[in-house]
From Swiss-Prot:
Top-rank taxon: Viruses
Other observations noted: PRD1 virions are composed of a tail-less icosahedral capsid of diameter 63 nm, an inner protein-lipid membrane, and a dsDNA genome which is located inside the lipid vesicle. The DNA is packaged into a preformed procapsid. The internal membrane plays an active role in DNA delivery to the host cell by forming a tubular structure used for injecting the DNA into the host cytoplasm.
InterPro entries the record matches: DNA_delivery_prot_P32/34
Residue ranges crossing the lipid bilayer per the database entry: 4-24
Keywords, in A-Z order: Capsid inner membrane protein, Membrane, Transmembrane, Transmembrane helix, Viral genome ejection through host cell envelope, Viral penetration into host cytoplasm, Virion, Virus entry into host cell
Biological process, per Gene Ontology: symbiont entry into host cell
Official protein name in the record: Protein P32
Keyword presence, Metal-binding: no
Taxonomic source organism: Enterobacteria phage PRD1 (Bacteriophage PRD1)
């Protein structure tokens, strides 16, 4: 895996970490909404990255 792959994994891990902290800290957190938002955002980024190839 190249430098780009390592950077991408680092960014995704950081986003997931922030989402986990937000869920833990907030007493009125919408856990399902947070997870859906994170996966939707990741899906959109992945689609954008693969658009020129497909």
């Amino acid at each position: 895996m190249g430098e780009f792959g390592k950077t991408l994994i680092t960014i995704v891990t950081a986003i997931i970490g922030v989402a986990i902290i937000a869920v833990i800290v907030s007493q009125r957190s919408n856990t399902a909404g947070v997870i859906q938002s994170a996966t939707s955002g990741f899906s959109n980024i992945l689609k954008s990255a693969l658009a020129p190839i497909i």
